[in-house]
């Protein structure tokens, strides 16, 4: 399957915010909430895409003619390439009805494990999202990184305890999600974390 075929297939079942553009640069989906594009000024995604383009891989032809080794080691574990799958949550809200979070995480974690890399899994207001991610990670030897939103401390501890049962490679928190609308106005408060709170989490 070519990249163009992947995009054409995606356009039949993705949306309404992601357009499966030929060039995924955040311009068409900018300032959509919810959605994959950056909120506010809508430049975060665009700037990230521009920065990626500054990184180039140059072919070296003055070397031994052998298989290129793209592997690297992180925290004592070796992976096939220095790239991991990013965490995505609320699949149907952002990307259409084809996959819910449970089905998506099951496919993603298994595929990444088979490819020799890690899958970061998402989080959301539905507790089943993290529960499903934990199940997928456990079924694949903990080959992934569950990513928890910056909830209140009690909820964070509950979710950490849940995902630790799957013995994941690591656990992450996308603290920049503090600006998401669904975290605003919660009781107890969710969102930004003080240095002291971060010390408790780490």
Residue ranges of model-derived segments:
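An N-cap/entry alpha-helix motif that binds or orients negatively charged groups
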Residues: 2-80
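Conserved active-site and cofactor/substrate-binding residues in soluble primary-metabolism enzymes
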Residues: 39-47, 103, 107, 154, ...
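Short alpha-helical segments and helix-capping/turn motifs at coil-helix boundaries
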Residues: 67-72, 106, 131, 155-161
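Metal-dependent C-N hydrolase catalytic cores
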Residues: 77-96, 100, 104-105, 115
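Hydrophobic faces of well-ordered beta-strands that scaffold small-molecule active sites
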Residues: 83-86, 117-121, 142-148, 171
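Active-site mouth loops of central-metabolism enzymes
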Residues: 88-101, 145-154, 185-189
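A glycine-rich phosphate/pyrophosphate-binding beta-strand-loop-alpha-helix module
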Residues: 103-143
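Alpha/beta enzyme core
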Residues: 110, 138-139, 151-202
């Amino acid at each position: 399957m070519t990249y163009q075929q992947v995009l054409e297939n995606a356009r039949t079942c993705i949306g309404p915010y992601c357009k499966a553009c030929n060039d995924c640069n955040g311009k068409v989906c900018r300032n959509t909430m919810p959605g994959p594009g950056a909120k506010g000024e809508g430049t975060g995604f665009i700037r990230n895409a521009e920065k990626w383009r500054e990184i180039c891989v140059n072919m070296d032809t003055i070397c031994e003619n052998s298989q290129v080794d793209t592997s690297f080691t992180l925290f004592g574990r070796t992976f096939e390439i220095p790239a991991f799958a990013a965490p995505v949550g609320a699949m149907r809200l952002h990307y259409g009805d084809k996959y819910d979070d449970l089905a998506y995480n099951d496919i993603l974690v298994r595929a990444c494990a088979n490819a020799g890399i890690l899958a970061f899994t998402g989080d959301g207001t539905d507790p089943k999202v993290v529960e499903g991610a934990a199940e997928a990670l456990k079924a694949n030897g903990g080959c992934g990184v569950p990513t928890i939103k910056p909830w209140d401390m009690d909820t964070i501890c509950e979710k950490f305890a849940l995902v630790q049962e799957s013995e994941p490679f690591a656990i992450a928190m996308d603290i920049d999600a503090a600006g998401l609308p669904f975290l605003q106005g919660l009781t107890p408060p969710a969102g930004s974390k003080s240095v002291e709170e971060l010390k408790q989490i780490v």
